[in-house]
A protein has these predicted regions:
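Hydrophobic faces of well-ordered beta-strands that scaffold small-molecule active sites
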Residues: 3-5, 30-36, 106-110, 138-140
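Acidic-and-aromatic substrate-binding clefts and catalytic sites of carbohydrate-active enzymes
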Residues: 5-15, 39-45, 111-119, 146-147
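Active-site gating loops and adjacent loop-to-helix segments of metal-dependent hydrolytic enzymes
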Residues: 42-78
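Hydrophobic alpha-helical segments and helix pairs
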Residues: 67-107
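Catalytic domains of cell-wall/extracellular-matrix polysaccharide-remodeling enzymes
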Residues: 90-148
């Protein structure tokens, strides 16, 4: 019942425009979910602001496993602060593209469930708290075994 939107993909604007052109034709209006992407594509924050997350060209360079490992390192706060910048920008980009959303109605998910990695989860919840956002939904790992 929702559409996941990845703000940092090259087709983002094209997808937003496609949705806008077709939205009146939908039988029901889907909810929009921010699909955080910290593993692929280009950082919205820019290489100069998140140098430990991206390569020289601004493409994400860390794997799921590396992010998990970083969660337990003494240097985790350095990474967490950079993750916060990227997470905040990705959420704001989606909300700006869909003004009918509010920060109280946002739904949050992530590519490969990275938002459940400890350092990423800490960054996400700090951003939510600092911005005083009240998400409607944050996906967790409790998935139904059967669809019915």
């Amino acid at each position: 019942n929702s559409i996941s939107v990845l703000a940092n993909m090259s087709c983002f604007e094209e997808c937003v425009n496609m949705y806008r052109r077709e939205q009146d034709e939908f039988v029901w209006q889907p909810k929009i979910s921010v699909h955080l992407n910290l593993l692929e594509g280009i950082s919205l924050a820019g290489a100069e602001n998140v140098p430990d997350l991206v390569n020289r060209d601004g493409h994400f360079k860390l794997s799921w496993e590396k992010l998990f490992f970083i969660s337990f390192l003494p240097s985790r706060n350095k990474f967490k602060n950079q993750l916060k910048k990227e997470i905040e920008l990705q959420i704001k980009t989606v909300v700006d593209a869909f003004p009918e959303l509010s920060f109280k109605a946002i739904r949050i998910d992530s590519h490969q469930h990275t938002h459940m990695i400890p350092v990423v989860a800490d960054a996400l919840f700090e951003v939510i708290g600092e911005q005083k956002w009240q998400p409607e939904y944050i996906r967790d790992s409790r998935e139904p075994m059967m669809p019915f």
